[in-house]
């Protein structure tokens, strides 16, 4: 989500490693014709509108056009907010990796409060919408997180290069760059190993919309128990009955009925 430091990491560490920066938000901003910078709400509205009109992966397609006409062979793409954008990039590029940056809400608020003129209510509204819209063409940051190959914790405020926090973040990012480019290989850390175990547990869930795995460990990393979310024992999984999540089934059914009503009214 915004304020987590994705842009900072991309421009500070990946650009210096030879990656060319490309932002889907910048592509979206080019669709605005007003001279004043658009608000985040306006950006969200236009992004949803474009995805509804031209497909949920329209911004990713525009990014691919830019990449196809450039000579660079290494790119870092910022501001991905819809799962269809990730799916297109993975189909289009054989070595495409999703790197997510995470910071807690309070840290992110402190980073962006001046842009919001210290209006916390507006920040909370934008933050909620940015992460949890249900529409296929909406803001799906939370779902994009679930598709991440790498998650970088960026919960510290970095004042300037050379500080301990800057060096720690740089070391983490460089490590993943070297792994991606095949320069070095590393054994996974204890935390990475445990998270992989939790993820493997999540795959046991028959819920078609959200899969969550968890581990209970002690201070030394010993696993005491593991688990995952599951459909209630008395219920059948939605995908067995409806072929998809029941909520999505209802949304699609409502959308089809509404479209039919509109077309009938236009035909009269």
Language-model segments: residues:
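A short, polar/charged loop-to-alpha-helix boundary motif
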Residues: 228-268
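Conserved lysine of the Walker
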Residues: 6
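Small-molecule kinase domains that catalyze NTP-dependent phosphoryl transfer to phosphate-bearing small molecules
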Residues: 58, 86, 113-173
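The conserved Walker
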Residues: 2
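Hydrophobic positions on the alpha1 helix immediately C-terminal to the Walker A/P-loop
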Residues: 9, 13
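ATP-dependent small-molecule kinase phosphotransfer cores
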Residues: 20-75, 80-87
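Conserved phosphate-donor/acceptor-positioning beta-strand/loop module used by diverse small-molecule
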Residues: 78-80, 90-116
